[in-house]
Amino acid sequence: MDTINQRIGEMLARVRATRPLIHHITNLVVMNDTANVTLHVGGLPVMAHDVEEVAEMVTHAGALVLNVGTLSPDWVESMLVAGRQANELDIPIVLDPVGAGATQLRTMTNLKLLRSLHIGVVRGNGGEIGALSGAGGEMRGVESIAAPENPLTAARTLAQTYRTVVALTGARDIITDGERGFIVSNGHIWLTTLTGTGCMATTMVAAFAAVERDYLLAAAGGLAMFGLAAELAAEKAHGPASFKTALFDQIYNLTPEQVAAGARIAELEW
């Protein structure tokens, strides 16, 4: 795994050197935090939602984030327009299917995006991935309260069905393209005390995907760095508020060498 860890460190170095624009069509709850995370990891954020400009904006982007946390018909149309342009230009799309499984509207909207666009990475929790794969799982609002019985099978099924990379995040993160896969063990329980940390993780994945065509490895790298930052932040924090501040500081201050040394990634065995 040393070579994989080295490649992850090199990806972070490329993000910092090239400062890719990450175009978000995202939810109102996390917009400010995900913009800041994009800046701290080394990218440039833009939150452009209007259907009249998204196709033009995405032409400048290194990656496109589609996040359905605060759904509206206008924004879904913008996601489809931006996504088609991203596909035309071979720009990676990272989908965050917030709340899939909680309501029929959320589930069907995410399935429409998956069927209409080629999605590079789907980053979701166990309940969301279970709902989209047909494997089950339980959501309360946008929070996963029960993962599918076999999360690995759910992730693999969704990846194979839509020819995408699935990053199922939890106590340990499962990342697979349906054939290969990784387990990322970095992280901290305090991530569950803040709203929007899954959306922040999605932004990290997008930043890495903007500089790495192997989206499986990019997803593993973004999640490993985010989890490592959380571990280090928890050492300095006294509760959720100080943890959030420390998390942002750690994302900003982590070096490629530290990420390569601290990432805990194992190859999946089927």
From Swiss-Prot:
Named cofactor requirement(s): Mg(2+)
The EC number(s) this enzyme carries: 2.7.1.50
Pathway(s) the chain acts in: Cofactor biosynthesis; thiamine diphosphate biosynthesis; 4-methyl-5-(2-phosphoethyl)-thiazole from 5-(2-hydroxyethyl)-4-methylthiazole: step 1/1
Catalytic activity: 5-(2-hydroxyethyl)-4-methylthiazole + ATP = 4-methyl-5-(2-phosphooxyethyl)-thiazole + ADP + H(+)
InterPro entries: Hyethyz_kinase, Ribokinase-like
Keyword Transferase belongs to the record: yes
GO biological process: thiamine biosynthetic process; thiamine diphosphate biosynthetic process
Binding annotation for substrate: M47, G196
Domain of life: Bacteria
Keywords noted in UniProt: ATP-binding, Kinase, Magnesium, Metal-binding, Nucleotide-binding, Thiamine biosynthesis, Transferase
SUPFAM superfamilies: Ribokinase-like
Amino-acid positions noted as binding ATP in the UniProt annotation, renumbered to this chain: R123, T169
EC main group: transferase
A GO term for molecular function: ATP binding
Pfam entry (one): HK
Functional summary from the UniProt entry: Catalyzes the phosphorylation of the hydroxyl group of 4-methyl-5-beta-hydroxyethylthiazole (THZ).
Family membership: Belongs to the Thz kinase family.
Name this protein carries in UniProt: Hydroxyethylthiazole kinase
Name of the gene this protein is made from: thiM
